[in-house]
Amino acid sequence: MTSTSPKSRKPSTKTTKSKSKSKSKSKAAKAAAASASPALARTPPQFRNRVVDKKALKQLVAWAYKTHGTAVTASMADNLKDLGFRYATQAAVSISVEDLKVPEAKQDLLCQAEAQITATEECYRLGEITEVERHTKVIDTWTETNERLVDAVKKNFNQNDPLNSVWMMANSGARGNMSQVRQLVGMRGLMANPQGEIIDLPIRTNFREGLTVTEYVISSYGARKGLVDTALRTADSGYLTRRLVDVAQDVIVREDDCGTTRGIIVKVEDGGFGSRLVGRLTADQVVNVDGEILAERNTEIDPPLSKRFEKAAITEVMVRSPLTCEANRSVCRKCYGWALAHNELADLGEAVGIIAAQSIGEPGTQLTMRTFHTGGVSTAETGVVRSTVAGTVEFGPKARVRGYRTPHGLEAQQSEVDFTLTVKPSGKGRAQRIDITTGSLLFVSDGQEIEADVTVVQIASVAVKKSVEKATKDVICDLAGQVRYEQVIQPREVKDRQGNITLKAQRLGRLWVLAGDVYNLPPNAEPVVQGNVKVERGQVLAEASQASEFGGEVRLRDSIGDSREVQIVTTSMTMKDFKLLGESTHSGELWHLEAKEGTRYRLNTIPGSKIGNGEVVAELADDRFRTQTGGLVRFAPGLAIKKARSAKNGFEVNKGGTLLWIPQETHEINKDISLLMIEDGQWIEAGTEVVKDIFSQTAGIVTVTQKNDILREIIVRSGSFHLCAETKALERFRGDGQIVNPGETIAKGINSEAMVFVQTEDTPEGTGLLLRPVEEYTIPNEAHLPELTHVKQPKGPHLGIKATQRLAFKDGELIKSVEGVELLKTQLILETFDTTPQMTVDVEAVRDKRAKTIERLRLVILESILVRRDTISDSSHGSTHTELQIEDGQSVKASDVVATTQILCKQEGIAQLPVPQEGDPVRRLIVERDEDTITVTTKGSPLVGVGQRLVDGDSLAKDEPSSCCGEVEEVEGKAITLRLGRPYMVSPDSVLHVRDGDLVQRGDGLALLVFERQKTGDIVQGLPRIEELLEARRPRESAVLCKKPGTVEIKQGEDDESITVTVIEADDAIGEYPILLGRNVMVSNGQQVHAGELLTDGPINPHELLDCFFEDLRGRKPLMDAAQEAIAKLQHRLVTEVQNVYKSQGVSIDDKHIEVIVRQMTSKVRIEDAGDTTLLPGELIELRQVEDTNQAMAITGGAPSEFTPVLLGITKASLNTDSFISAASFQETTRVLTEAAIEGKSDWLRGLKENVIIGRLIPAGTGFSGFQEELRAEAGPHPDILAEDPAGYRRMQNLRPDYTVDMPAAPAASSTAVLADPSAADLEATRSRHGIDPAASNFAAFVRPTGENELEEEQLPDPSALEGLQQEGLLTEE
């Protein structure tokens, strides 16, 4: 497979070899290569008989690439592909249903799981575990069964049918994976519901056997969730990538070596370094135990060297890292190490920031695809250790353990320190030693005798720390009865911010519900039986009565269906001098009220409807106040209105008077001006066509309003027009005009006979006065109120009618209209003088008592009482029986009883009343029936007492276990009476919904269990977790961190609840940390703690952690060192956390990518005190910049600035970048640009983004300016031939900077050279002379600059370069 033709065995066709080797080195290499190649060609091909799966294929391709370069690898991969397809075709590999073979072990595994789950349910029934623990155990049981089934599937295929198509496909990694094959031939497994909670009913079948209907529905849940998640996560992942690119886009390799002596320490993990050292440079000598130097400083570590370190048992290596690189605003080649694309030092100008961002962001999309193939939960990543010998357990003197309850409800112990546990055999043999790590769970105790193959310990995994979230689960009652607390629970009342009181359990314990028949009592029902009294079936237990609130006349509606409504008329009012008349129109019924004198009121409601306070009952139908057209309103002195205007009804008249009306006709047109048929200011007669199809109704002067050639309005003002030359008169009436009384002189020869409104008008005939008629309307002081008859109960609500006059318009208002308007409305308004806002009044039509033909309007207020109907026994209310105590038409007084309801007993038993709570009436009562108790007669003497609670299996007498759960009610001789019950376990901090002694119905909530669940270790949580880390989010309830190192002392508060952890520091200072309830303390008395160590469990706040590190170091070190060290500690932590999330998903990302991002997040500090520098307090500045400023201050003797390091999330870091163009293109564009403008910022265009936006060459790769400068410096000064050349050799712009040539000073008249098309041979010669790789496309690969500025002679440009080019035919003379 690996034999290739001798021709393709050139040592390497790699394009980018470093020139930084010295001359002697390169000559030696050439010699070696020359000697190696003939031998290489003669090596016979080696054949290896081995299965090549995905992993082996990866290694093969990597080896080929490394030893033979790209071209050979590509052709080899092609040959392999052809080989594979050819044999697959010949073997006819395809998949049929027959290939899906279900392992025989499946049935046994399912039976075992069922048995385990039955046992778990039994534990829950006996109150040994909580609902949450039951759920967790069920889910873990199924998950474990699933895993074992996968193993069975693998084993089945491997042993019985290794060439099965499905197995080959999944096993080779060609397509699909085991989790999918498992669903085809194992079981589909657990599914999650749309809320993301796992349904504890798994899908036991697989797709080969077929799903039941229920399973199919559940399966679709999971599948849908997978699809939706994928869609959402793709978007999330893309956004994460965008933010990462934004924060790191200006990180470019700009220097060869920054010269730093700092580095980071990489420690051995799982017995080796793996690939974590490969591609890095050592920051210090690496010396083995014997003092032999294995690697000097700045040595590139390749895989063989890494292996050598491992062999020499080296535990940690200090390597250079982007985190500690001191290059300004970039990283240097030595700190960055290899560019992983071609496993060599990164080139200058390589945009490593963007590569890092894409490397971290890209797996996000992949990871999301793995959401639900695995069916929800990942198994616990913990190692269980079983005993290998039978014997005695010894913990040893170092051990420190504390009690712990596992998620499955098992009692265990958790180790607080690392120690070694020994199992000493009872007979002969070697003792078993087990290393216990902190946090491991021990299922045995010190000195315990155990058998072989017993679970001893569950070792805590140091894998990814999954983030936890608080979740709740309800405990629902399965039977009706009375609640009893166990003493252990110790409920306490907790007040929240709103002042609501909740009851919480403090300790783990049980709530009991003792069986009985519970009756819910209706409101205002009172028990009529005493406690502990025997009651018979059908006996009245409680009675409720319903009374009238106000009293009045009773109306009984005919019992329509089950509605039992009793109405009582409490207040009524009849309008006795109005007849009620109704008429039918096509738009519905119209009702009128007619008075004796003939005035009519329009009714605004209809009989049978309801109206509320302040609503209009009727309106006077009166045409006296109706105008012919629109016009202008003027109030004569004396007429007064209320200021406020109600939206619909206009202004209420306070005092009557005269209203003056000046009519004017307004046509609103909104048509083109060309349709106008008259002129502005023209006098027209009534009936004139003013615009096509629109006629004037009155005679008068026309005013035309137009805008942008659109005709808006035409106003016709009627009256008589008089030309006038008297200036004084014209001025007097110009503008708003004036009202002139009869007999007054208006101007010379113009007198008013009636009241007129005079205005000065300019018309085509000339200026004059327009005398407009004024109409007068007299408004009375008060409206007429009809006579009413009242009937009212003493306590009942009041009813009244108020007559009001309302004006539609205020003084000076102009009404634009052609039709007339109603100026005054007289309305009858309902008034109820009652406190209840929701009270409504019924409108009724009644016959007059004397004249039966006449109908009158009556308004009534009804009190409606709903009477309960009889129910035959229902489960919670018992049987009820209701009796009415009144008849139709009867008159009742306030608080008279209308109906009584009795609650009847369903089964005989002993009635009991609950203990009433303060202020709470009795809402329920319980009858303890014969079937709720059981009497057991024991053989021996009883071992139990009255009041004791027992569960199945507890001893009643010697060797006589109880067969049920309950409370002992009495013991007489050997007869024990038990009241049946059911225990429910509640965990600490659960919210209790019931109090001791309360009565509950089946289905009531007893408690709300609060628990922490791990956010599933699925990347569904992985992406948000990475986002949380990179955005440096502050967790809601973070862990308490130790601020200064010292010794721990734990103090209990007086109330036995609050805990305070005190840390006695080195200088005997005491740090106090109060611990909130419900928090687990992670330290023990006398333990030594460091700064930043966790005192309680919970997520860590990274900002707080940085402060802890910095504050601690600041006391012992100079400011700069403290900041650098604190940042380094945090950086290490962040890199590890991000790596853990990806590793848990099996995604490998090189550390350096994460380091580049983390470096950007931690590069800034906040100035606290500026000292004598020009910095501002609160400003965010690069650490390097502050360092330089403070060094300058040290030289000049000024006060340096004080600062604290800050951690910025990626979004914040992007917005705080030096380049405002880049920040503005990311988010909050306006804010960023305005701030930059106000501060007068400059953008130095250092990054890629800002250059792309402005349209310049990006400073990476070939556009990297530093690169060009360096080459120019090597080549010596050259004039730019293109800059001074007007003829323009544009094609020479494609040449690289190291391609510039010396121009000899030519005489003025001399001819200039012009580029000719070179022949292939010429090009070859030129390329070889300038060191250009022929494999690269047109001059695309260029020589890498050297490190030590050593150049081989043949690389230097020839002083007579121009002549050389001419001789080669590249330049011709014209």
Swiss-Prot record:
Its cofactor is Zn(2+). The keyword Metal-binding applies. Pfam families: RNA_pol_Rpb1_3, RNA_pol_Rpb1_4, RNA_pol_Rpb1_5. Its EC number is 2.7.7.6. Residues 7-28 have a biased composition (Basic residues). The keyword Nucleotidyltransferase applies. Keywords: DNA-directed RNA polymerase, Metal-binding, Nucleotidyltransferase, Transcription, Transferase, Zinc. Residues 29-45, 1362-1374 have a biased composition (Low complexity). One of its GO terms (molecular function) is DNA-directed RNA polymerase activity. Binds 1 Zn(2+) ion per subunit. GO terms for cellular component: DNA-directed RNA polymerase complex. It catalyses: RNA(n) + a ribonucleoside 5'-triphosphate = RNA(n+1) + diphosphate. NCBIfam families: PRK02597.1 (NF002724), rpoC2_cyan (TIGR02388). In cyanobacteria the RNAP catalytic core is composed of 2 alpha, 1 beta, 1 beta', 1 gamma and 1 omega subunit. When a sigma factor is associated with the core the holoenzyme is formed, which can initiate transcription. DNA-dependent RNA polymerase catalyzes the transcription of DNA into RNA using the four ribonucleoside triphosphates as substrates. This is DNA-directed RNA polymerase subunit beta'. It comes from Prochlorococcus marinus (strain MIT 9303).
